[in-house]
Amino acid sequence: MKTRMHNGSRLLSLLLAVVLVFTLTVPALAADKPQDMNLRIAVMSDLHYLSPDMIADTADFEHALNSDRKLLKEGSSVLREMFKQVRADKPDILLVSGDLTKDGEQECHASLAKQLQQLQQDIPGLKIYVINGNHDIRNYNAKNFNTPDGKAVPATRTHPEDFKRIYDFVYSDPTVIATFTPAAGNEAGGLSYVARPVEGLTIIAMDTCRYSKENTSNGTDEHETSGAISADLEKWVIEQTAAAKARGDLVIGLEHHGLVPHFDVEPTILPMYLVNGYERIAQEYADAGMSVVFTGHMHAVDIAAMTTKAGNTFYDIETGSALTYPCPVRFVDLRRSTVGGETRTYMSVSTKTHTGPIHYTAPATGTAHVIDDLTEYAREFGFSTDMLKTVAGDFVKSFFGKYLPNDTWPVTKIVANIDQIIDDVAAVPIVDGKDLLDFANWIYQCNLAGEDDGNYPAWVQSGIDQLKSGALLDQVLNIVAKDAFGRGSVLFTKFQGLFTRYLKSQLNDLLVNIVVSMSVDNNCPDDNDKTILLEGSSAQVRLLPVTGSSAAVTQAYVQGSTATVFLTSRQLRAATNAQSGATVTVNATDPVADTVILAGHSIANARSAGVAALQVQFAAGTVTLDSDALAALDLHKDVAVSLTGASLTAAQQRALGSQAATATLASASVTVDGAAESYPAGSVRASIPARAADALTAWSLAEDGAISAVGGAWDAQQQTYTFDVVSGVTAIARFPFTDVPAGSWYYGAAAYAYNNGLFDGTSPTTFAPNAVMSRAMLVTVLWRLAGAPAPKGVNTFSDVPGGTWYTDAVTWAAENGVVSGIGGGCFAPNSNVTREQTAVILFNYAHSRGYDVGARADLSAFPDAGSVSGWAQDALSWANAAGLINGTVYGGRTILDPQGSASRAQVAKILRSYAEHVVNA
């Protein structure tokens, strides 16, 4: 019994374990269906906001400016203009990846928070998520420079609880679904949180900053530049990521410090810009399901990626500072859709720079200024001798401590003469007109701007060659020795002796690696504009040429025959050489696409770049949107441009008649978010190869076969026909009649009659629409409509001579009961046919062909109904019911006018209706 009980307990335990495992694992294995998304995200970083109220024209503030490259004086106005850009862009989400303030001044946090809240009020539905940077919390550098005596005083420092309180509109937002709580007694990571702004997207904001004693290198509650993620925060992030993936969400991270190096030697020379243990943590985050992290800190525009052993790719998208060159704002279009059971998610990143004009009043002096181009303005605030003199002393001490720890005796002399040394080193010539300071700024700024593509100007290449040869380092060391110790002195010689060939080789190799690493991006070189496929086949991301007066490329997300592109300001500036008035062409012929979606803010960017016309090149031809169309289209919606061949409905086939086999057919369209868009006539035109012929014209064919004229012209040199884009099928065909106006009520009927051989022209180029129709003409038209059959008998009308153009038609009509003449053996072929005669002849024709003629209409509403001849009443009632004769307007009234004559235009329209409503009903 005991054995049986023991085995039963084991079995029960096993069953319980299976149930427990199944219960815990099924939610993770059976993740919710991924939600479709179409989101616009604005990304800013390192705002370093310093309130104008805390700025004064003092020596202390000047010292602060010389210690940095930030546009602190202009900062308030710069942010105002950037927020204006965000308002115009109308994003769904704004992310700010840390360093919100200059140095964590609580007054600045409070002011910035109000500005962000106002931005949120101005953009309905906007969600804002911020995270702190190393400058923002417990920063002893927080100062107020605007004091009565001109001496800077400490500003109110911001503590973690202050940050949460000030940005309560973020932390208390209903979309914030979790916050991180550190272990008792700890604070590290305590500002981290999770937000779910929409179904399908989870954002994990991670506090990677060091400001509490358990997380700082010296054990104090004081900020440090470097970043760290504690073990408990790391575990929490992984758990939150896994939970988000289980509910089918895409997971995006937000933090200040980097998780992937942005240039090769960053871990060596600037490790404080990466989170500690970044390699392991990035792999764990990626394998847990996080796809992207938005970072800042380095003030550079860069995208870097790494792939784990499990095959998961992780992107670190770094955004530069708003207040240092190139002063960027990122805009991200996030698209997710499930097609055929496959989830496809892609993110298109674009970078907006060259903001301007910016009007600002210098807080310190009250003088007014205008910044025409913020990026070019900030370019001038690179490394300067004043800035280098301010920070060089600490660098010298650090250098000797690292490379010559046993020979620190030169430090005092070097620091004492640092100003002269800096001036002389900066002035080392590279080529005529360019010195070493220019060289350093070029290398650094190309990295900051994400322009580190290895395309060096000749003078920069010369500097690199001199650096690689060791010549530059020799010059620098000689200058230091001369300025610090005096040329030829004992200390001069002793100093030079410190730098052995081995040490100089080490230093030179390091300098070369730094320069090359910062100017040649070997990891995701498309730092400013990149389409990233997060879920789906990588083969779906392709490059499309963009050409204007110059050339560029754009990335396209290709699904079948549709290519989605995000034209960025940067690409358009490159394609137009930053000059307005150019036509820019997007080439969609390789891969072949018949629809190009100009997504995100492509239209807005084209307008802001001064593009005169935006053209899409398809295999079938081109579609061009001119400036009027660009001005009319919605700036914030996707515009789909399409050009394909076309297949015809049966009604369209009949409308083209004999020309169906020879006409050039196309289907062109411009739609906005899937719906037809209105734009000025003639502002959107397509060009397609067409067969050369006289009197070519463009027709729009409705599904029911109705023909209308489309503006267009033949280009004999290009052998193309250019026409206005309208909805539906466009046919390029021959139509020789110059007396049929394009907008006339009978245009389509005349074209139908011509295409089907029902009417001949009165001359090679005239239709004579207002000429009266004779009885012979009408009968001949019906005979042709029947296929021009040979009559079986002989003509019996005395006034219809043999051998005329209408003899066979009249003979056929008489023997088939279509006409019976006017009496006395006569037909009166040349008499004008009246409207009621037309109705009778059509009725007889329909009856003889076996068509349904049972419909009847009440004609009593027509004021002249009583004037209808008795022999015509039944036929006219049928013709009205069938939609053939609907009355004519005369003297402001609609009348039947039964005895009135019928013009060629009227009969053509009646026959078009007859063919569709009776013959093909």
Task: Walk through the language-model features, giving the residues of each.
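Sec-dependent signal peptide cleavage junction
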Residues: 22-33
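N-terminal active-site segment of His-dependent metallophosphoesterases
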Residues: 31-109
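Non-catalytic terminal accessory segments
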Residues: 31-33, 358-547
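His/acidic metal-ligating clusters that form di-metal
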Residues: 34, 90, 202-205, 216-313, ...
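Extended active-site neighborhood of metal-dependent phosphoesterases/phosphodiesterases
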Residues: 111-235, 310, 331
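Proteolytic cleavage junctions
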Residues: 546-551, 556, 662, 667-755
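Proteolytic processing hotspots in large secreted/extracellular or virion-associated proteins
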Residues: 564-703
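Feature responds to low-complexity, polar/acidic, surface-exposed segments characteristic
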Residues: 711, 717, 722-747, 755-756, ...
